[in-house]
Regions:
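Structural marker of alpha-solenoid helical repeat scaffolds
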Residues: 25, 59, 93, 127, ...
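Conserved alpha-helical positions within TPR/SEL1-like repeat arrays
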Residues: 34-38, 42, 65-76, 99-110, ...
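PAPS-dependent sulfotransferases, especially Golgi type II membrane carbohydrate sulfotransferases
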Residues: 206-207, 219-230, 239-302, 353-384, ...
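Phosphate-binding active sites in nucleotide-utilizing proteins
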Residues: 299-402, 408
Length: 540
């Protein structure tokens, strides 16, 4: 039991005496059950953890440490609302407890309450400044909320509290990348790998810098790691994707493609995606918005918003960076607010989108538009207009323009083979479950293409395409047309987009810090291996 307490103390930043105080009031039998549950939770053995906690709850149903672990277990099982309620009960029994606050913040964040999560993490760090986990969670949440400099400071504090905190070094690297400090980001990832050479996320994050090139030594290290029989599957997947980048970088394309197929197949087994059901959803959206919504005379609602919609890896970050280089535009990146407003209305009505669209009144759309503008108001604090490039927003263009009639929508497009191949190379942090087989990628691209073609056809005054290849060939003319469509005066700074200093929180963060690159196409390297993809996309 002492060894277990010592392990927890080192992990959390709380000393052994504090851990002993946490168990005050528990019998030796209950303490044993709590320790067993805690170990099982750490190892993600939820059935075992619940069995141990059931015994502890029978002996001490209102003990705060027992309830804290129950809340953590609920979180691990994905029952976030129950986790929040349980952790609030624990906090009522032990007010001002930093560890409970830290756990509560994690569950609030998982349930979508980012403001509540930040408040909990901030209070935890105030009460226990040595608690590395609270600083880490604070930094991670600040990063998600686009408060990037604050995130950096919190993550640096987490590392000061716990120099061996590998995950903090990885997320710090992500934050530095967003701030344009690519070399510092690489050093942070490399330091994480010095601490744990098998940290798959650190390897993939290093690969995901895009502008950094691996060498033969990196490729050999990754090959050895990939062959390790005892590697955790998540690490094996991350290392697999990183190995693809290393093999590409040293010109071994046949091996790279084989590794790419294997890494994607492993990831696909862990996610759920139903392509036919998604296609039927797109059918329903097309039927719900057969024509453009009416624009009320003189309406300016939503004039501040420029939606940049696309599939991943299609030039949307580059397009946003060009717009954000304009003196009138703030680049807000991938905001969750449009789908959140739509999903909230669906819950209120008890009908999934787009099932309620036919009964929505002009007043309903205006209300939803005002809700969106209230949620995103901070993005106009310094500049009058902002971009929103949420990855699922292409599905909601009809709703967005009904809500915000003066908004503009830019549809980013890239060669479909290059788009799908680039997505296939990308291990996404979350979502994009369609991207782990070429067949499902092709089906998703076809759904994107038919819906976005519909938007531009029915509403060309408010929806326009931005083609990546045209931007590469004619950067000044294409940029000029983009600005004109958005109602912006031409500014030469938009041609020097790579000089903009905003935080960029996507996989292309390092690339948009450089001038336009014309060497991003890679399909030619793989030859006949992509024939089935080309057929599925209808490009052969």
């Amino acid at each position: 039991m002492k060894a277990n307490k010592k392990r927890h103390a080192e992990h959390s930043g709380l000393d052994q005496a504090e851990w002993q105080r946490r168990f005050a009031g528990l019998t030796p039998a209950a303490i044993g059950m709590v320790e067993a549950a805690s170990t099982a939770i750490e190892r993600r053995r939820t059935v075992e953890a619940r069995r141990s906690l059931a015994g502890a709850l029978a002996l001490a149903p209102r003990h705060p440490e027992v309830l804290r672990l129950l809340g953590v277990l609920c979180h691990l099982e994905g029952r976030f609302d129950e986790s929040v309620a349980t952790l609030r009960d624990a906090l009522d029994l032990r007010p001002g407890d930093a560890l409970i606050l830290n756990n509560l913040g994690s569950s609030l964040r998982a349930s979508g309450d980012f403001d509540g999560a930040l408040a909990a993490f901030e209070e935890a760090t105030r009460l226990a400044p040595q608690l590395a986990g609270a600083w880490f969670n604070l930094g991670k949440t600040l990063k998600v909320r686009a408060r990037t400099e604050e995130a950096r400071r919190a993550l640096e504090q987490a590392i000061r509290c716990s120099p061996g905190h590998v995950r903090a070094r990885i997320v710090l690297g992500d934050t530095l990348k967003a701030l344009g400090e690519t070399q510092a980001a690489a050093e942070s990832y490399r330091e994480a790998l010095r601490l744990n050479p098998r940290a798959g996320q650190a390897w993939f994050s290093l690969a995901n810098l895009k502008t950094l090139r691996f060498d033969a030594t990196d490729a050999a290290r990754l090959a050895n790691l990939a062959a390790s029989p005892d590697l955790a599957e998540e690490d094996r997947i991350s290392i697999g994707f990183a190995r693809v980048k290393a093999l590409d970088d040293i010109g071994k394309y046949e091996q790279a493609f084989a590794a790419l197929v294997d890494a994607n197949a492993r990831k696909r087994r862990l996610v759920h995606w139903d392509a036919p059901t998604f296609s039927r959803q797109v059918d329903a959206i097309l039927a719900a918005f057969p024509q453009a919504s009416c624009v009320p005379a003189g309406s300016t609602r939503g004039r501040e918003v420029i939606f940049v919609v696309s599939l991943p890896r299609s030039g949307s970050t580059l397009t946003e960076q060009i717009l954000a280089a304009h003196s009138q535009v703030e680049g807000a990146s991938e905001l969750p607010d449009l789908p959140a407003v739509i999903e909230g209305e669906s819950r209120r009505r008890g009908v999934a989108f787009p099932g309620w669209v036919g009964t929505a009144t002009d007043g309903d759309w205006a209300r939803l538009g005002e809700e969106y503008l209230e949620r995103t108001g901070r993005w106009t604090a310094d500049r009058p207009r902002f971009t929103d490039k949420g990855l699922s927003n292409w599905q909601y263009v009809g709703a967005a323009l009904a809500m915000l009639p003066a908004a503009r929508v830019v549809v980013c497009r890239r060669d479909p083979v290059e788009t799908c191949l680039s997505c296939f190379h990308q291990l996404f942090a979350q979502g994009q479950e369609y991207s782990y087989t070429l067949a499902e990628l092709a089906a998703y691209w076809r759904d994107f293409d038919r819906l976005c073609t519909h938007w531009t056809r029915i509403d060309p005054g408010r929806v326009a395409d931005m083609v990546y290849e045209a931007l590469l060939e004619r950067p000044e003319a294409t940029t000029s047309r983009l600005l004109e469509f958005c109602g912006l005066e031409f500014e030469s700074s938009c041609l020097r987009f790579h000089e903009a200093t905003r935080a960029v929180r996507t996989a292309s963060a390092a690339q948009v810090r450089e001038p336009l690159r014309r060497d991003t196409a890679r399909a030619a390297h793989y030859g006949p291996a992509l024939d089935t993809l080309k057929v599925a996309l209808g490009v052969r």
